[in-house]
């Protein structure tokens, strides 16, 4: 079990909900395939190549699903009792090609895929979430240093502050260069 020190046990999402979502999605896909016999070819339409389909794999898959449900059941009950996930919900596996949506022509598509947000909430020792000094946002992918040198700005405000400071420095340097050139030209 992983534990996120920054989030504690008050995570916004639950692994149980994610697991249920994926299981429900799997069931919907199976029901869709069962209801649409033309969606994929039947075993009878496969040309005889001397290889018979391995029906034992379907039985093995069914056993794996049953064992997964029985293994997850106690964990999901404990999560619902505690009111939060027992692992770090911000650490998610990378999407595989098999998890991508299926387009109307039956091929995998990247069109509907959006990567998960990497924003997280930092909890201070007093139990309060850390807030951005500029906008007050508590969720960010990275905390950045601000005008006081402390790490007090969210990523968006920190980048804006850095760009503003870089622009100010560039304008000072260009005005300094212009003054020096003007002085040297007069001599």
Curated annotation (Swiss-Prot):
Signal peptide: none annotated. SUPFAM superfamilies: Glucocorticoid receptor-like (DNA-binding domain). Residues 106-127, 167-187 are annotated as: Disordered. It comes from the Eukaryota. One of its GO terms (biological process) is cell wall organization. SMART domains: ZnF_GATA (SM00401). Keywords: Cell wall biogenesis/degradation, Metal-binding, Zinc, Zinc-finger. The keyword Membrane does not apply. A zinc finger (GATA-type) spans 126-180. GO terms for molecular function: sequence-specific DNA binding; zinc ion binding. Gene3D superfamilies: Erythroid Transcription Factor GATA-1, subunit A. Induction: Expression is regulated by the KAR4 transcription factor and reduced after pheromone induction. Pfam families: GATA. Involved in morphogenesis. May be involved in cell wall organization and biogenesis. This is Protein ECM23. The gene is ECM23.
